């Protein structure tokens, strides 16, 4: 089987500086990581909060869009539904950590056999509750977070 790697289990993507209120993604460092994962044919995924950086927000979102691709997925990590939807409809792969919404999504899925959906002006998006948080599963079995350009927002409960 193919290697499977989650980057930055703690921390975030490489930045040009690490001053707390200013984190600009270091594209050069990110590119080196990408090339290393390609050499080893590794399915790689990670999460970032660097879109929250007030000063470098747009730069960081563009850097994510530029570097996130098949087998190298950078998930935009959110806590608020409105932000999750905004980034999803802007073409990003998105995860949200929201225990209340997670519990609703799991309940809906168990009761109806269908994924809970969020309806918005821009369209409808399905929620995928993290399998490892409510089923006998794990990241290596599921791999949903490593799917590029996916049609769902993945939802976690706080952990």
Please place each PLM-identified region on the residue numbering.
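Class I S-adenosyl-L-methionine
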Residues: 1-159
């Amino acid at each position: 089987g193919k290697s499977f790697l989650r980057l930055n289990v703690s921390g975030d993507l490489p930045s040009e500086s690490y001053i707390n209120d200013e984190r600009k993604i270091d594209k050069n460092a990110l590119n080196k990581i990408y090339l290393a994962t390609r050499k080893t044919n590794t399915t790689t995924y990670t999460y970032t909060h660097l879109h929250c950086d007030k000063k470098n927000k747009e730069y960081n979102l563009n850097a994510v869009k530029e570097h996130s691709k098949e087998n190298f997925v950078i998930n935009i990590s959110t806590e608020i539904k409105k932000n999750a939807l905004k980034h999803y409809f802007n073409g990003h792969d998105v995860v949200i950590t929201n225990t209340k919404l997670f519990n609703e999504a799991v309940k809906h899925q168990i009761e109806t056999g269908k994924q809970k959906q969020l309806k918005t002006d821009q369209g409808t998006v399905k929620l995928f509750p993290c399998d490892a948080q409510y089923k006998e599963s794990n990241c290596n079995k599921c791999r949903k977070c490593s799917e590029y350009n996916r049609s769902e927002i993945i939802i976690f409960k706080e952990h």
